[in-house]
């Protein structure tokens, strides 16, 4: 099992193999459908981007309300295919990792290979457990989207599996 840190480096990414378990530490940014839509609209309109995503990881997640005394609420993955239409633009912008659940389209897999990125899978239905790996959480963009806003999470040993590696190999 590899332990890796963000921001992701090309060497780290290229050493990962499909199906391999990984523990990720560092910063990840949550973003679901509506945040992806806004990010890609900002790219198309050449607007100022709300954060620098170069070499960063996006987690397809909309955390639930934070319970008193906790860092974050439940934070399980959402279906990655819903982000497929937005993924190529974000990979071109420098995103190097994505975390979610489920298959990616052939087009997204080709773009992952082209941009030497990686797609990670994490455990569906385990949002409360995954929250235990989050050390800090802060809202960074699109507050009006509620749980679909972009949050900056500091994670420690967040459990993942390589779903699509930088060579375009997929577990599916």
Where are the regions that the model predicts?
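Short, structured beta-strand/loop micro-motifs enriched in basic residues and often containing a Trp
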Residues: 1-8
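Short polar catalytic/cofactor-binding loops
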Residues: 8-10, 28-29
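Feature captures the catalytic cores and cofactor-binding loops of soluble hydro-lyases/lyases
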Residues: 30-31, 35-158
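Active-site/ligand-binding-proximal alpha/beta "capping" segment
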Residues: 85-87, 161-172
């Amino acid at each position: 099992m590899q332990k890796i840190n963000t921001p992701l480096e090309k060497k780290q990414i290229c050493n990962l193999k499909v199906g391999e378990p990984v523990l990720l530490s560092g910063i990840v940014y949550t973003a679901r459908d509506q945040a992806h839509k806004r990010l890609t609209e900002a790219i198309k309109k050449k607007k100022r981007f709300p954060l620098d995503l170069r070499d960063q990881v996006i987690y397809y997640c909309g955390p639930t309300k934070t319970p008193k005394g906790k860092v974050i609420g439940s934070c399980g993955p959402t279906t990655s295919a819903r982000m497929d239409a937005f993924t190529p633009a974000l990979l071109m912008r420098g995103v190097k990792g994505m975390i979610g659940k489920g298959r990616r389209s052939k087009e997204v897999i080709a773009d992952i290979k082209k941009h030497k990125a990686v797609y990670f899978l994490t455990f569906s239905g385990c949002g409360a457990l995954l929250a235990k790996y989050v050390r800090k959480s802060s809202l960074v963009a699109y507050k009006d989207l509620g749980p679909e806003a972009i949050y900056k999470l500091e994670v420690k040993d967040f459990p993942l599996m390589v779903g699509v590696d930088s060579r375009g190999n997929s577990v599916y």
